[in-house]
């Protein structure tokens, strides 16, 4: 069964998450994450007459081409990232947390990190693994190192959910 990507879900997620991170007070990692958010916003708004959904699709294609060309890493880094997040969050074993909701949060974080990377690739014309490291590090320092921020962040992500969790599948396509 093929599921057609729905870039509207990804675009909505990107807009919600960048808005959330830009509203936080400055702390460790904020300047670096903001640099990549600004890159993403530049790429998504660069061409008049092209929808943000189309730009999301374009930058994802740029990233896919670069990953395919990278003989050493390919998709391993991103696969390992999502596997690490599943392990770190003890998915399915968190008391008082619906496993599907926890998985949605992991997938939303993964999709946002991947889109920030895709924007950097699109703007530079090449994949820099230092950028991936910077994005992951700054994202986690902004979203995970303060329990109140993490709770608010998860609440903010919930605004993108459609309620039936099908949007999670679109984030993975």
From Swiss-Prot:
GO terms for biological process: bacterial-type flagellum organization. It comes from the Bacteria. This is Flagellar biosynthetic protein FliV. Belongs to the FliB family. Required for the secretion of flagellin and expression of motility. The gene is fliV. Keywords: Bacterial flagellum biogenesis. It comes from Salmonella muenchen.
